[in-house]
Structure formats: structure tokens, C-alpha cells
Amino acid sequence: RLFKSDTNCNIHIAYGTIVNELKEVSRSYKEARMALDVGKIFFEGQDVIAYSQLGIGRLIYQLPIPLCKMFIKEIFGGKSPDDFDEEILTTINKFFENSLNVSETSRQLYIHRNTLVYRLDKLQKSTGLDLRVFEDAITFKIALMVVKYMKYMETLDY
């Protein structure tokens, strides 16, 4: 890690937008605070996070948990993404990393293209979402992020 002291403590840095007037410092501080929180959820490997980097994580972080639960239930039925085996989750994440490119994903996973297609078809049968279709891929990606957010929020509820 970039910032690690002798006491084994991790240091995380977050910052908001640059401001020109003193009255805007409060807003930038709130943005930095949010960047720190959202960074813990969606940017685990990063020690420095900017508010401008948060993307859709910033929106998900502000969703009420009951709405998240309803969304996940609609997308996955009674299932949870945790029910998927590690192989399919690795496949999905790699597929997203490669911008839904079947050939490049299969190459990076060291599997035949047809094996990847089979896995995607299998996922489509269980979820109704075809990750090769952009809209379905977005829905699935957001659902995975929402699940990650809900898990994080559960750890805060002692």
C-alpha cells in the first residue's frame, strides 16, 4: 500500500472539488467525506480517491436500503449474486473489464470463446439478463454494486 506506517495502519486520502471562495470549502469538505466513504466500498485498492472519480458509486451510496433490496429482488428474484460460483463471478468481472468483448475476455481467461459464450448463456438462463446486451450489462453491473453497498452498510449496523 502507498501509505502504510510502522504501526500497520492504513491511510486513505480523499478530496473534493477545487474551490475558489471560502464559502465553498464546506461543500468540498462534504464531497471529500463522501469520497472517503464511497471509496471504502467501491475502490478498495485505492489509497487516494477524488470526488470526481466516484461515478455511479456516488449515486448508489445515496440510495435508501429498502429501495436497494427491492431492486435486487427484481433483478435476481430470490437469488443473490453470492449464489453464483467463483468461476462465473470471475468471468463476469473480466467480461466487464474488457468492455463486453467476448474474444478478449476468453483470451485473458485462457478459455475457448465458446466456453465463455456457454457461461454467458447459462447466466442469462438463471437471471434473464444477457450481458452481451449493453442495457442488461449495465443493469447487472449496477446490481452488483448495489449488493456491495448493502453489504457494507450491514457492517455498520451493529
Question: In which residue ranges do the predicted regions lie?
Answer:
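Cytosolic nucleotide-utilizing catalytic cores of signal-transduction proteins
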Residues: 1-158
